[in-house]
């Protein structure tokens, strides 16, 4: 297979546009999110090298990927889903080894992540990671925390999200979720 240079650059452009639209929708009062958005925009505006040695890999949860892509209805997110579809055979889906002894084995049949832009992504960037988290039906991603701040956009389906010890709240396609470093969070797919 030929390396998907054009598709990767289109994905980068679509993600950059998503983050630029975010920049205008949050106030400076939301300092940590605003700083996160600024860092991602700055990094994506740089020329990034292709990771020619990148090796594709699939996980059991990838059985849901085509459905997730086809169910993306939001016009802005549809562009991202279309580029994901064009890249899907090049993606290196992984399991988080940090949770191997924490979560049940069945969890790993219904969860995986892929880094598209980042230190080991299709496009190399040392200071940010842009990728996908794929969860199957009826999956509880237990409460956890980590050093990385994260920004999620729901592409398809729905999910219940919990931040700290608050209630789970329904998130639908197009909804955006941000949590800062070490903020405890959990999700449960419907």
Language model segments and positions:
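Residues that recognize and position ribonucleotide moieties
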Residues: 126-128, 152
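Short, basic/aromatic beta-hairpin or loop at an interaction surface
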Residues: 147-159
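Short beta-strand segments in beta-sandwich/barrel cores
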Residues: 140-141, 157-162
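Asparagine-centered strand-capping/turn motif at beta-strand->loop junctions
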Residues: 188-190
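Conserved short histidine dyad/triad with adjacent acidic residue
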Residues: 113-120, 128-146, 167-168, 181-182
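A short, N-terminal "cap"/entry segment at the start of jelly-roll beta-barrel domains
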Residues: 8, 13-125
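Short acidic-glycine-tyrosine-enriched beta hairpin
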Residues: 151, 164-186
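Extended repeat-based interaction scaffolds and adjacent low-complexity, acidic/S/T/P-biased segments
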Residues: 1-2, 6
């Amino acid at each position: 297979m030929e390396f998907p240079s054009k598709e990767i650059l289109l994905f980068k452009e679509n993600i950059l546009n998503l983050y630029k639209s975010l920049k205008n929708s949050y106030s400076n009062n939301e300092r940590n999110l605003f700083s996160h958005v600024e860092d991602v925009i700055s990094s994506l505006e740089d020329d990034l090298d292709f990771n020619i040695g990148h090796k594709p890999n699939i996980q059991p949860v990838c059985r849901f990927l085509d459905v997730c892509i086809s169910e993306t209805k939001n016009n802005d997110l549809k562009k991202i889903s279309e580029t994901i579809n064009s890249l899907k055979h090049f993606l290196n889906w992984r399991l988080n080894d940090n949770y191997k002894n924490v979560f049940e084995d069945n969890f790993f049949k219904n969860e995986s992540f892929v880094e598209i832009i980042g230190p080991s992504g299709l496009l190399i960037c040392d200071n940010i990671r842009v990728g996908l988290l794929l969860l199957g039906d009826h999956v509880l991603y237990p409460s956890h925390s980590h050093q990385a701040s994260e920004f999620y956009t729901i592409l398809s389906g729905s999910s219940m999200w919990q931040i700290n010890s608050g209630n789970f709240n329904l998130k639908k396609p197009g909804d955006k979720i941000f949590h800062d470093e070490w903020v405890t969070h959990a999700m449960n797919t419907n």
